[in-house]
Design a protein with these regions (language model features):
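Extended, H/D-rich, highly charged conserved domains that either
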Residues: 250-260
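Catalytic core segments in nucleotide and nucleic-acid processing enzymes
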Residues: 260, 265-341
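Intrinsically disordered, low-structural-confidence terminal and linker regions
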Residues: 1-25
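A short, surface-exposed helix-loop junction/capping segment
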Residues: 235-251
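Hydrophobic/aromatic-lined pockets within catalytic cores
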Residues: 210, 214, 248-249, 267-274
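Charge-rich, low-complexity terminal tails
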Residues: 2-4, 256, 268
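Interfaces and regulatory segments of ATP-dependent nucleotide/adenylate/phosphodiester-chemistry enzymes
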Residues: 28-240
């Protein structure tokens, strides 16, 4: 018998079995929730009632938010999903991904493929499922609307019929989903397989949504107006430098503000065509940059998509002992033979 070369789903009257290439088959039994599923659902509700998602949004609103367990590829995957949102499509699937990552962050044992769960014998349910529509309407959509992260109907994105078919969420899910379907499936698979950190993925997605929110854009526009007025007032560069230094020294997030300041100076050099290559954007948050192949906070690469770093600056503020920092840079340089101090 030839080896299977594609995924497939076997549907029985009381269960479904998902076969994926390179993975063990998983059977999802239908029926009323098990005691373990009830316990997980209760904990999820309790944590959401306590403001779990709002706490994550507030955490991601801070300049020093840390996201340490995502690779560059994982970040790009989430970026593609967020960037796919338009006025017409993409919002429901992003909302669903936020819901899935939230559930998995609270209860790692909960499958995020099984979107229905009930004790009602007349309703379709998986024994290890979870009622995502209920959780969405009560805890996810209201919070996303409150913070302006997604423009959603008040009834919730799970009211979309295409997300409510009685099949597990997988690459074999039959309904026509508008938006970043392939990215959603990949994220779902990675999380379920234990290859994608759900909490850090949630925080990264929230951070991306915050940066795209109308409120953030308005704040950015207002800031630029204030800046133009300040520059037109005739202030000299020494006063500007003093203002920046005072802001760094008095900020609650001095280390991060220092990084932003140095990168801002680099942007000015870049606009004047004084850099030898492409200036990489500053990371949205402070992360484990060694894992991502970075050397410093500010990096100039030979071309836009090149991994060849020709100049890097690692901003350090308030560090009295630099030996550990230098050893860390030494470790990073081992990954970049084209670079030297």
């Amino acid at each position: 018998m030839e080896k299977d070369i594609t995924d497939y789903l076997v549907v029985h009257p009381d269960q479904s079995t998902l076969y994926r290439v390179g993975e063990e088959p998983i059977t999802y039994a239908e029926g009323k929730l098990t005691d373990k599923a009830k316990t997980r659902y209760l904990n999820i509700r309790v944590q959401l009632e306590k403001g779990y998602l709002e706490d994550k949004i507030n955490e991601c609103s801070q300049p020093d938010v840390k996201i340490e367990n995502l690779s560059k590829e994982h970040m790009e995957l989430i970026d593609k999903m967020v960037d796919s949102i338009t006025s017409e499509v993409g919002r429901a699937i992003v909302g669903l991904t936020v819901l899935q990552l939230t559930l998995k962050s609270i209860e790692p044992a909960q499958s995020i493929r099984l979107h229905k769960g009930s004790n009602n014998s007349n309703a379709f349910s998986w024994q290890e499922g979870v009622p995502m529509r209920v959780l969405d309407k009560n805890f996810i959509t209201p919070v996303l609307r409150k913070y302006g992260l997604l423009k959603l109907n008040a009834d919730g994105f799970m009211m979309t019929r295409s997300l409510a078919e009685n099949y597990p969420y997988s690459g074999l899910y039959k309904a026509a989903i508008r938006g970043a379907r392939s990215e959603w499936i990949e994220i779902t698979n990675l999380v379920e397989d234990g290859h994608l950190h759900p909490e850090d993925s949630l925080k990264y997605m929230i951070s991306s949504l915050l940066n795209k929110s109308d409120e953030f854009q308005k704040l950015s526009d207002d800031t630029l107006v204030i800046l133009e007025k300040y520059l037109d007032s005739g202030v000299d560069y020494k006063a500007i430098l003093t203002l920046i230094q005072e802001f760094v020294e008095t900020s609650e997030y001095s280390a991060r503000i220092f990084e932003v300041s140095i990168h801002s100076f680099s942007q000015a050099l870049d606009e004047l065509k004084l850099l030898a290559g492409h200036l990489k954007p500053l990371s949205q948050m402070r992360s484990a940059n060694k894992k991502h192949g970075n050397i410093g906070d500010i990096e100039v690469t030979s071309t836009k998509n090149s991994l060849s770093i020709i100049e890097a600056w690692d901003a350090k503020y308030g560090k009295s002992y630099m030996r550990d920092e230098l050893e860390e840079i030494s470790d990073k340089l081992e990954l970049h033979v084209e670079t030297e101090i």
